[in-house]
């Protein structure tokens, strides 16, 4: 199942949510993975809190290390491979329906970065984009950049991700997408977005962030060295 989310001032920018069926066990596994990663960075890589957080201005040490790990590497959890296929199927549908790319021409070279965000009391993500300044600084050409978020666990109250109009005259207009556990929302990487705050005094807000890129083949190795990307469709080979 999928949901199309809103129109920006008459301009349709594809912000599309896909629903993972029966997400309870997957989400429990993802909470365990995110908690374990957070413990590692807090206890072993304490100084990494000074790393870039991608413009989100969050206190979450995981977000400050978003390019240092990939949740999809954790294949000791049986649900991760199934989840990766769901992500792949969702991106396939999005690419075929909402982009000018031919999926059969891009699927062999789509790479995905997938990290965890864990927001505590009062925390939220400031307005930011996922378009990589690292790649543009090094003059790498990205034929395709698509991002996503996956909602793992609510803090116990409604939260929203707000997607802002890319039209200069309407920069403060946004489409709010209610966060729902088990929903994967795909959007163009250039779209600015932020989140509402976690108001719970005791519970964290768990999500995954994702970037999918399709680098030119001659630049792929150099681009991949900047992160911990996995080939999205490698399990199909």
Roles of regions detected by a PLM:
Residues 108-186, 196, 203:
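Catalytic core of non-heme Fe(II) oxygenases with the double-stranded beta-helix
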Residues 1-102, 124:
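Non-heme Fe(II)/2-oxoglutarate
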Residues 30, 159-163, 237:
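Short secondary-structure transition/capping segments
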Residues 73, 78, 98-105, 125-127, ...:
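Short helix-to-loop capping/linker segments positioned immediately adjacent to catalytic or ligand/cofactor-binding
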Residues 21, 119, 151-153, 211-215:
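Solvent-exposed residues in well-ordered beta-strands and their adjoining turns
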